[in-house]
Amino acid sequence: PGGELAEECRRAFLLSCFTGLRLSDLKTLTWGDIERAPEPMIVKRQSKTKDVVRIPLAPTAWELIDDRELHHRDELVFPRMTASKGVNVHIPLNTWRKKAGIDRAFGWHAARHSFAMMTLEASGDIYSVSRLLGHSDIRITEVYLRLLDSRKKEIIASLPELKDEQKTFEFKQPKQA
């Protein structure tokens, strides 16, 4: 049973990395929240905001939940995570963190944070990322932009310096015909 919970938590955490879903929404995610056609997509009323989010599923995200079985619309996608009040979904996370040699503790929200950072970095489209996350105000999403700005500084600082012979350029005028 513990191994099954850990595997379910692994799939849920990774799904959050690819969808930005909160833990509360992962726990209440039903098969009825997932549209399979024309493209796999999660259409979910968020627990926190009560707003509906529509999140297209990347192939990697779809593979995490597609078990190729038929499910009732009301059936939970991750039933072990909500089986009882005593289920601690943070234990598997800490176990993985320690096995990976990561000293700094993190929680489930790190997956949502990772999604926000990856999608913003890849697209630069703060409006769409804000909608995917279900933020009620774009200013909430702007917090991630500030983090990306510091990341940009790191990237620029890591660029190699030009050698002296590379610093001068010789421009020639095109010949007149």
Model-based region annotation:
Residues P1-L23, K27, K48, H71-H72, ...:
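Basic, Lys/Arg- and aromatic-enriched nucleic-acid-binding interface segment
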Residues C9, P38, D51, H72, ...:
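Exposed loop/turn and edge beta-strand positions of beta-sandwich/beta-sheet ligand-binding modules
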Residues R11-L14, F18-D25, R112-S136, V143:
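C-terminal catalytic core of tyrosine-transesterase DNA break-rejoin enzymes
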Residues T19, S24, T28-D67:
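Conserved tyrosine-mediated DNA breakage-rejoining catalytic core shared by Y-recombinases
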Residues D33, S114, S123, S136, ...:
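The DNA-recognition helices of helix-turn-helix-type DNA-binding domains
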Residues K44-K50, L133-S158:
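Catalytic-site neighborhood detector that most strongly recognizes the C-terminal catalytic loop/helix
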Residues S47-D66, D74-T95, G107:
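C-terminal catalytic core of Y-nucleophile DNA break-rejoin enzymes
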Residues D67, R80-M81, A157-A177:
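C-terminal secondary-structure termini that scaffold catalytic or DNA-interacting sites
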